[in-house]
Amino acid sequence: MPTITSYFGFLLAASTITPALLIGLSKIRLI
């Protein structure tokens, strides 16, 4: 089922991109 794999792939990408964006925003605020 390609729909389920693409769904989990989207969750994996979101779970890796979101923390990176939060860390980037926190670093910008510290600067």
Swiss-Prot record:
Keyword Transport included in the entry's annotation: yes
GO BP, one annotated term: photosynthesis
GO CC aspect terms: chloroplast thylakoid membrane; cytochrome b6f complex
Bilayer topology annotation: Single-pass membrane protein
GO molecular function terms listed in the Swiss-Prot or TrEMBL record: electron transporter, transferring electrons within cytochrome b6/f complex of photosystem II activity
Pfam families tied to this protein: PetL (PF05115)
UniProt KW keywords: Chloroplast, Electron transport, Membrane, Photosynthesis, Plastid, Thylakoid, Transmembrane, Transmembrane helix, Transport
Locations listed in the record: Plastid, Chloroplast thylakoid membrane
Domain of life: Eukaryota
InterPro entries, per the entry: Cyt_b6/f_cplx_su6 (IPR007802)
Stored HAMAP family: Cytb6_f_PetL
Subunit-structure text: The 4 large subunits of the cytochrome b6-f complex are cytochrome b6, subunit IV (17 kDa polypeptide, PetD), cytochrome f and the Rieske protein, while the 4 small subunits are PetG, PetL, PetM and PetN. The complex functions as a dimer.
Protein name, UniProt field: Cytochrome b6-f complex subunit 6
Gene assigned in the entry: petL
